[in-house]
Structures are given as C-alpha cells and as structure tokens.
Amino acid sequence: MLTQIANRDSRPSFWPRVREFAVPPSMIETATARRHVGDWAGACAAAGIDVDLNLRSLARTHGRELAAHVRADLRHLAPDLLRWHMPRIAPDGLLRPGLTIALARYETAGPNGACRLHLVVRTPPAWADAGQRISLTLWDGSHSGAGFPGPPHPHPHPSRRFRLDLHRHLWDARRTDELRIRSGADRLSAAARPAPDQVPAGPDQLGTVRQERPCAVDRWAAEAGILLHAEGRAAGTVVVRFGARHRLLLEVTADADGAEPPLFRIAPASREHGPTALPVLPDAATWVLPDLELLRTGSIEADRLHPLVASALVPDHAPTDRPRVPDRAGRTGLVECRGAQHRIGLVDGVLAPLDHDPAEIRREELLVALTGVPLPCLQAIDEAHRRPDCLDGVRERLVHGDIAGALAVVEGLLGPDALLRGGALRDELEAAAQRRIRYGLFRADMLDPAPGRVHVHPDRARPRGRRSHPRHTTSR
C-alpha cells in the first residue's frame, strides 16, 4: 500500500473517505441551523472551528465600519462548507497542517497609514492536529499575528498558494451558486475535455500535468485573470505549483477590448522566477474540484455531497435524508454456537447473549476465569469489545474529529452502558482522548513540539511578538 501511494496520485483513493467521514451530516445540519438564525459563533463551534477574534475589540481598535464588514462576512460564513473545501493531504485526507488561509481582505487605517486586515483560518501543526480543529482569527500583517487572541502559529502569514479570498464561493453562503461556473461543471464533462493539443502549451509540459493529476487546465486562463485583476494587472505571468518542486508558468494575455476571455500559454518554470517574484495560482484553482471528479467517475452520489455543493453541481438534484452513521441499536447478531444459531443483542444497555440463561452465563464466565474456552456467543461478544468489525469506521471518525459519530457507532454495537475491555477499540478511544489533551495544551500555549520536530537555530533571536510565560514554569 505504501509503495502504491508513493508511485501514484492518491487523490481518488482518499477523497471518497474524506467525503464520508470528515464532515458528517450532523455537523452540517447543526451548523446550518445556527447560521440561519444568525448565530455565526455557534455555527463555527458546531463545525469544529475555534473563534479567536472579538468584534467589540475590533470596533475599538479599527473602527465600527470595519467591524460591520467583518460581522457581515461572519454572518454568511458557512463553516461546515469551509471545512468541506479545506486543503487536505494524502494518504488519510487530513487537513493540511500549519496553514494560514485568507478568507477576506479589508482595507483599514493603521498607525502608519493605510493597511490591510485579513480574515483568516488556521490549521494547527501536525503534532497538535487532534480533532482536526480549525481556528478563525484576524491577521494585521505582523509577523506573529500579535494583537488578536489565539495560540502562536508556526506560519502566521497567509499562504499565497492556499488562499480562499478569491474563492468566496467555497465558504460564503451568498455565493455558493458560483461553484458551478468556477469549477467548470457548467460546460465540461468527462468526454468533453479538450485534448492537450487544443491548449497553447508545450506538449511535454501539458502532457505531464494532464496525465499525472486531474488539473483544471481549462479554467486556468480565467482563474489567472481573476488573480491578476486582484493584483491590479490585466495581464502577466502566473506561477502554477504542483508541490514543492514542480512548477509551470502561465503567460496570460488580455484581449484588447476585453470582449474575449484572456489567452494563456504554458511554459516551464526556470530558476530565475523565485518564490516571491510572481503571483501564484491558488491551489483551489489548480485542480479539478474533487467533488466534480467523484461525480464524473461515479465514486459518489449527489446525496453524499454537502447540500450547497450538490445544489451547485447538480441543480436538478432533489435532496433526500440519508443518514451515514449506521444505526445498530436494537439489531441482533447471529452466532454459530454448539451446532445452532444463537442471537446476541443489547439487554439493559449492554451486549449480551440472548439464548443462554443467566446461570449458564455465570458458569461460563467462571470457566473463562480459570483459563477455559468460552462459549462461541461469549467469544463473539468479547471480540466485539476488543476488535469489532466497525473498528475502521470508528478510527476514521476519531481521526477526522467526529467524536460523537464514533461514540454513536460504539454505543449502537456494545450498548451505552458497556464497559470497554482491553483491545484495539479501547486503545483507539484512549489515543483520541490523549490527542485532544495535546491540542488543548497547544491552544493554551502550554506545550511545545516534541524534540526533533522543529529545527532550532541557536543564533536566531526570539521574535518580538513572543514573550515568556512565567506562570507556566515550574519552581526549582
């Protein structure tokens, strides 16, 4: 499996699992209900987003007008949709760690003249990514993001590659209808993609791009035009990044009267174009939308998509209620026991054999305590406690932060009053609890990375935005 992941693109393999586990229906329903009544903070809490900003403080420091603009964006923020579209990494489809992503930019007056304030979301570093939490805050251009609450972040500056301020349809409920056009779903199908020789580019460069990964080459010209317009230019060169080492250049030429869409030519990147010399095409504009690719390949049904995504990509789709968490409560299992089929099911909140009387069960439990072989029914119950068939699903939900969904699966199988026995299931639940504690310590700025995770430069001065916390030290 590791060899396959290393030698091929793993996007088709992890995106179906991400769509099943990363943003559960209960999160979407709760966040949507709270957003509809104007409770943007409650919607963020339901979507696993920690709010690290205070609008009253913002009004005092930057004025009421700016605070009103930020509040308007927050009231229309769909945090569950934002989580749906966040950048993810292989092989498990977890959130890309250590990112600061700009959602919106605001012009404001600062102590040194006009400045730009950013509404950003941040993902924690990989060593503190328990629960796949996201933080929402403001960034004022300082190195450390000082002036706004929240834990110190390894990369406080908004990423040039991973940005959503030019893709508000991926988080703003007012503009979700734009997804169909911006993704190319309105005019492209799997059989209608242009051939490589129909796009002005070198066959070697374009052939590599189109074959290795599902790139949205057909949208690059329009998306590059949007990027250049945001930079105050009508034409120019844009860098397209495919990881740390693979880059291409888009040379965009605008039509003289603006009646026609911009033209572009793909060229190989050279060493002359440094990381800060040219604007970078946002990652959201580089690839084909994962949901669109899943629909085209038949890997997912429209019912499994986020409702706002499904309504944009499949306008004629009629949504139906289809819970994804299996409801196992009240179900009985069948076990081959002593030449007959016996039942096991929930009794008084615990999983128990249904075809054996209590006296027989007590004798069998005593036999097990004396190292005897238990009944097949008791063996099945013990296996369900230690390593159930649903373990993979429980693990996926825990990793993606769906604690409630994981516990619902466990309680549906073992009962709400079950006492877990030692085994893989209990280990997974305990590990998830430990990871949540680590994340809490990271949020409180009481925990640093483990030795070896961060390379420390002894000759580098401490950033001015950081200070020591004497109350966190221990006495000697």
What are these model-derived regions, one by one?
Residues 217, 223-226, 238-239:
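Alpha-helix capping/helix-boundary segments
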Residues 1-211, 216-218, 229, 413-476:
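N-terminal membrane-targeting/anchoring modules of bacterial envelope and secretion proteins
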